[in-house]
């Protein structure tokens, strides 16, 4: 059984993308000229790959994330304040908001894009009052 998850994303400018994710408070594990690995958690990393490198692995070409949503990546945090802080940091670093914040009683989330148009969400699951 697999014990780790590696999500691979194409990026146009690895240096700018690394600065964007650093501004969100995320750390990196290793980097080459065409790849940097963002540590999301102990068992999850997002591999930022320069587009030509990503294309060498892709069977069907590279999707234009600015024109099509290829996936939605969700970062789970503990509090509403952390959701707001993460989304605000993303916007301050050049990301764009996606939709309005969602608050339906059991979850609170805000969406944003990274510099390459990949759709991210910051999410807090709210414990019901006892």
Which functions belong to the PLM regions below?
Residues 37, 87-130:
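Vicinal oxygen chelate
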Residues 5, 32, 106:
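Exposed loop/turn and edge beta-strand positions of beta-sandwich/beta-sheet ligand-binding modules
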Residues 20-23, 86-90:
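Short amphipathic alpha-helices in soluble, non-transmembrane regions
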Residues 1-19, 70-75, 126-130:
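N-terminal beta-strand motif that seeds the catalytic metal site of vicinal oxygen chelate
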Residues 16, 80-85:
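Short, conserved charged micro-motifs
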Residues 54-60, 130:
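A short, acidic/glycine-rich surface segment
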Residues 63-68:
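Short, flexible turn/loop "capping" segments at secondary-structure junctions
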Residues 8-55:
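Core segments of cupin and vicinal oxygen chelate
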């Amino acid at each position: 059984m697999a014990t780790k998850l590696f999500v691979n994303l194409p990026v146009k400018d690895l240096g700018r993308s690394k600065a964007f994710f650093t501004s969100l408070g995320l750390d990196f594990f290793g980097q080459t000229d065409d790849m940097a690995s963002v540590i999301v958690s102990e068992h999850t990393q997002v591999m930022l790959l320069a587009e030509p490198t990503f294309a060498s692995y892709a069977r069907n070409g590279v999707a234009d994330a600015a024109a099509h949503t290829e996936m939605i990546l969700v970062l789970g945090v503990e509090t509403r304040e952390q959701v707001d802080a993460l989304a605000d940091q993303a916007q301050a670093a050049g990301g764009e908001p996606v939709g309005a914040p969602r608050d339906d009683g059991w979850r609170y989330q805000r969406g944003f894009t990274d510099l390459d148009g990949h759709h991210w969400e910051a999410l807090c699951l709210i414990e019901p009052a006892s």
